[in-house]
């Protein structure tokens, strides 16, 4: 009931929200996001009310923040929706089937989700603190092509606020040309929830990055990585990666399943090697 009431009020005051300055918009958006989170079984009211209050306390001193455009607000909302959908998929523990399990404990699971298709879930433990993974996967995102052979290049096309970016990713061809050149345009959203960090995203449209000649524009479905300190061993990190991709084109399902499952296993191995060879961001590897 509370969520429905807020949505009704928000819809009737949309023009008023658009006239607000940046932080005012963020405060209103935060309330909507947290109400959605509560509807999905999120934290108690006191926690998110304090977060909104902290944002609101900055309004008086930063009223000159630029407005977000309608398109930027749409990207922010799309990133939030991708995160909520991906976390909802991970939250449901029923129906997952084992695809592979490595000697080091790395495990890939899969599940068919209505309106999404087959998704893959990687579960690994990395012998590095969470902050180090955050540096590599978020702050140095554009350097991923240096250490992940499955990625030729990632570029940040636009940054919106502190949590949302639009990216273009050019994937490497799979050995034997089983899967030809693909690229992805995605909206990505990064959030911290207590000791947990969530990196989420999905396909989006971006006029300044049209489809490239000779490259198939594939699409990420709701996808995310969840990072959290390993219980009882905070210097290590539990990484969960939900992968949902529509590769487009005509490809047998057996090949798609094999490629995506192996992509996750390879990613974990390459990430570990990167972290071992470049233990800190300051090293400027």
UniProtKB/Swiss-Prot annotation:
According to its UniProt entry, one GO biological process term is: intracellular cholesterol transport
Chief place where the protein resides: mitochondrion
Reaction catalysed by this chain? cholesterol(in) = cholesterol(out)
Q: Does the keyword Signal apply?
A: no
Q: Which residues are annotated with the PTM Phosphoserine? A: 57, 195
What are the protein's GO molecular function terms? cholesterol binding; cholesterol transfer activity
Please give the CDD domains that the UniProt record associates with this protein: START_STARD1-like
Ranges for the START domain? 67-280
In which tissues is this gene expressed?
Corpus luteum and adrenal gland.
Subcellular location, record wording: Mitochondrion
- Pathway info: Steroid metabolism; cholesterol metabolism
Q: Which GO terms describe its cellular component?
A: mitochondrion
Q: Which UniProt keywords apply?
A: Lipid transport, Lipid-binding, Mitochondrion, Phosphoprotein, Steroidogenesis, Transit peptide, Transport
KW Transit peptide (keyword) present: yes
Q: Which SUPFAM superfamilies match?
A: Bet v1-like
Matching Pfam families: START
Q: What does this protein do?
A: Plays a key role in steroid hormone synthesis by enhancing the metabolism of cholesterol into pregnenolone. Mediates the transfer of cholesterol from the outer mitochondrial membrane to the inner mitochondrial membrane where it is cleaved to pregnenolone.
Subunit: May interact with TSPO.
Q: What is this protein called?
A: Steroidogenic acute regulatory protein, mitochondrial
Q: Which organism is it from?
A: Bos taurus
High-level lineage: Eukaryota, Metazoa, Chordata, Craniata, Vertebrata
